[in-house]
């Protein structure tokens, strides 16, 4: 079995790519290139109701503008439905999933009220069902999703954030892997995709740390080898909240339209990760020799209007 390093960039066309996305992509790309590995690109467009027309093409153009190249063809999730269906069938056969007819309001009313910022934990209302019960529900015309049975919560060592342990039984509980609309949920799709694409290292934002134990359970249930994970801090505004419209227009398309050079933005992001002494123009490929995951600050990078003005963007 090959031990070659393979990383990935996985933009979602549910909206435009912004400076925060660019920083995470840069770290992921450098991690793979500095390790002598390859980089794959996947368009995560499985959440079709939220997809913005033209956003996928724009995301790829933004990656090229940043100087982040990739290997092989671009993978698009909406062309891979048979792979996800096969994975679901495997989970059914080993009784790791069950049909769930609960609506969001059902769950909210049945579950104990979470503390601020916490996820509602599924109370297990439909957990008594087996995969074979789906046929009767279909005959009765009852819509249902498929939930994965959470029996334990695997700990993992994050390449950046260190040891992680999340008790899924009290932080979400049994989770959806297939939506009632007939499409795979994020957790199942990314596991199937990363395994099929040969991804060995996933570098992404630390807001996705809670997703990792769920994905590790899926890897185990499907008999797949999981990649290594590195979750890096996000980019936030001056108020400490993750980038949004309230912080002004931080879309890469807006920076490009304003005449910002890609080297200027890459230099700013490289400086924010500790690879440069000051935010000076530099190409992404010139940072490969300077890349060190451990130099990235543990706290989120605060993007201010002053920093944007310094690279020629008034917002």
Feature annotation, model-predicted:
Residues 56, 81, 104-107, 119, ...:
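Alpha-helix initiation and N-capping motif
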Residues 105-245, 251-256, 305-315:
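Active-site cores that bind ATP or allylic diphosphates and position pyrophosphate for catalysis
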Residues 1-115, 206-224:
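N-terminal Rossmann-like or analogous alpha/beta NTP/dinucleotide-binding catalytic cores
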Residues 71-73, 226-229, 276-282:
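Short, surface-exposed acidic
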Residues 69, 97-98, 116, 120, ...:
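A general structural signal for well-ordered secondary-structure junctions
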Residues 35-37, 67-70, 103, 174-176, ...:
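Short, surface-exposed, polar/charged, turn-prone segments marking secondary-structure boundaries
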Residues 58-66, 92-96, 116-126, 248-254, ...:
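Short, structured secondary-structure boundary patches
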Residues 1-16, 34, 39, 134-136, ...:
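Non-catalytic terminal extensions that flank enzyme cores
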């Amino acid at each position: 079995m090959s031990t070659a390093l393979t990383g990935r960039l996985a933009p979602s066309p549910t909206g435009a790519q912004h400076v925060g996305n660019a920083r995470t992509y840069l770290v992921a790309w450098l991690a793979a290139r500095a390790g002598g590995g390859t980089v794959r690109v996947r368009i995560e467009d499985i959440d079709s109701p939220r997809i913005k027309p033209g956003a996928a093409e724009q995301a790829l153009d933004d990656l090229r503008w940043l100087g982040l190249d990739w290997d092989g063809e671009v993978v698009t999730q909406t062309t891979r439905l048979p792979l996800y269906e096969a994975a679901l069938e495997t989970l059914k056969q080993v009784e790791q999933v069950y049909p769930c007819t609960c609506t969001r309001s059902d769950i909210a009313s049945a579950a104990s009220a979470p503390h601020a910022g916490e996820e509602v934990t599924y109370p297990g209302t439909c957990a008594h069902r087996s995969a074979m019960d789906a046929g009767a529900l279909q005959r009765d015309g009852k819509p249902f999703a498929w939930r994965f049975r959470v029996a334990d919560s695997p700990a993992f060592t994050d390449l950046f954030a260190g040891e992680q342990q999340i008790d899924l039984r009290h932080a979400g509980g049994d989770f959806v892997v297939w939506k009632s609309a007939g499409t795979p949920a994020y957790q199942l799709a990314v596991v199937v995709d990363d395994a099929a694409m040969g991804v060995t290292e996933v570098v992404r934002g630390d807001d996705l740390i809670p997703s990792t134990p769920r994905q590790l359970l899926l890897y185990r249930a499907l008999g797949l080898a999981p990649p290594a994970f590195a979750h890096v801090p996000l980019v936030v505004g001056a108020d400490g909240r993750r980038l949004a419209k309230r912080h002004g227009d931080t879309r890469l398309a807006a920076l490009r339209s304003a005449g910002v050079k890609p080297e200027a933005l890459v230099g700013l992001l490289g400086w924010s990760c500790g690879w440069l002494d000051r935010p000076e123009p530099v190409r992404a490929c010139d940072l490969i020799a300077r890349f060190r995951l451990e130099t990235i600050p543990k706290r989120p990078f605060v993007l201010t209007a002053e920093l944007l003005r310094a690279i020629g963007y008034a917002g």
